[in-house]
Regions:
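Hydrophobic faces of well-ordered beta-strands that scaffold small-molecule active sites
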Residues: 3-7, 45-47, 76-78, 106-110, ...
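N-terminal beta1-alpha1-beta2 module of alpha/beta enzyme domains
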Residues: 1-75, 342-345, 355, 369
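Internal, glycine-rich beta/alpha segment that forms the wall or movable "lid"
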Residues: 16, 87-195, 210, 214, ...
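Short, acidic/polar
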Residues: 25-36, 94, 181-188, 285-291
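Glycine-rich, proline-tolerant flexible connector loops at the mouths of alpha/beta enzymes
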Residues: 44-67, 82, 114, 201-204, ...
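An alpha-helical appendage that flanks or caps ligand/catalytic pockets
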Residues: 5, 130-164, 207-300, 306, ...
């Protein structure tokens, strides 16, 4: 099972000091956090994509390319790539280039985002959000799998004899996750292609997550990709830890109370009860995270949000040290609980091996027929 972190890249005032980091400071902090993730033994770092204040990650592949040059093992991903407003040709080329730079340590999570104004900023109509996601991904899927593409759709100029460059590393496109909070159409899309489904459930109760994941698993099997338990699932989460729960709650409360993303909603106690947010001791985080399997089934990727709400870099790095200490326990416990036949999360190496096996099998069949 893969464990990692994702960032939304918010620039938020620290309510305990009144200081707001500059964009430059926040960007540099994100890079340090990503490198720290590898140092403490995590598997994945993912960044969102935003084009409006107070967020800074407007160019995920630029950021991930820098991180790739300074890490050796970490899988580099997005927690949202805006399939609705980005040109699929540019996505195809940018992430193939990143594949080559990172020696395959790349996957990508498609999503529609949660900022309605981004549509007109990029010349699109929000009322066409789902059709855009469906059509643009269909083109991207083809661009990565065909050397020469002819294409005509509703939302972009036609392509004739087009080849996106560079081609995917080893002829293997990045593994794709489809991220969704509430859109069943995106779960359907992930199932149709046999891709991964990431339910970013950080603000949602368990029963909603259960329904979304169950839908994806059911449709994954419907489209003939395998049994429901073989579908590739990822979940989000939020944690804040200290050695004892009282200190964790006391320290995190002002960040929860003042962060725009939480402000004016339920209390910290209600929010932790209703969503995956866990504020407490390391053991409480372990126990709570293990319960995710009860409503989502066996799953392959767990990403935590840890660097938000104005938390200073020093605190986030301390949190990562603590996460690095509990992840081995989570790996062991999840592995012991996992049912037979549940696959691991795909990686570039596993996808390349599967492609080679398929090629060898085809060659053997051809030889037999001759």
């Amino acid at each position: 099972m893969q464990f990692g972190i994702f960032t939304v890249g918010d620039v938020t005032t620290d309510p305990t000091t009144g200081r707001t980091p500059t964009e430059h400071e926040r960007i540099k902090a994100i890079l340090r956090i990503a490198i720290k993730a590898e140092e403490v033994g995590l598997d994945v770092f993912a960044t969102g994509e935003h084009h409006n204040p107070p967020f800074v990650p407007s160019s995920p592949t630029t950021m991930l390319g820098y991180i790739a040059a300074r890490t050796e093992r970490l899988i580099l991903s997005t927690s949202t790539t805006l399939i609705t407003t980005n040109d699929p040709v540019k996505i195809a080329e940018d992430f193939a280039m990143l594949q080559h730079i990172a020696d395959g340590r790349v996957d990508v999570m498609m999503g529609r985002g949660n900022t309605p104004p981004v549509y007109p900023w990029f010349g699109q109509d929000i009322r066409q959000g789902i059709p855009l996601a469906v059509e643009n991904y269909a083109l991207l899927h083809e661009l990565w799998r065909k050397d020469v593409v002819d294409w005509q759709g509703r939302f972009r100029t036609p392509l004739q004899g087009f080849t996106s460059t560079p081609r995917p590393l080893d002829g293997v496109p990045p593994f794709v996750w489809h991220g969704s909070i509430r859109s069943p159409q995106i779960a359907e899309q992930a199932a149709y292609y046999g891709d991964g489904f990431f339910h970013n459930n950080i603000f949602w109760p368990a029963d909603h997550t259960k329904r979304m994941v169950a839908l994806y698993r059911e449709r994954y099997a419907h489209y003939g990709h395998g049994e429901p338990h073989q579908a590739i699932v990822g979940l989000g989460g939020q944690v804040f830890m200290r050695k004892n729960s009282q200190d964790a709650v006391r320290e995190f409360r002002p960040y929860f109370d003042h962060a725009p993303v939480y402000g004016g909603g339920p209390s910290l106690e209600d929010f932790t009860e209703q969503t995956p947010l866990t504020v407490g001791s390391p053991q409480q985080v372990i126990d709570r995270t293990l319960t995710f399997r009860e409503y989502a089934g066996d799953y392959q990727r767990q990403l935590f949000l840890m660097d938000h709400a104005g938390l200073p870099l020093k605190t986030v790095l301390e949190q990562l040290d603590m996460l690095g200490e509990i992840v081995p326990v989570l790996r062991k416990e999840f592995a012991a609980l996992r049912a037979p036949g549940v696959p691991d999360a795909p990686t570039h190496d596993s996808l390349r091996a599967a492609k080679q096996q398929s090629t060898d099998g085809t060659a053997d069949t051809d030889d037999t027929e001759r």
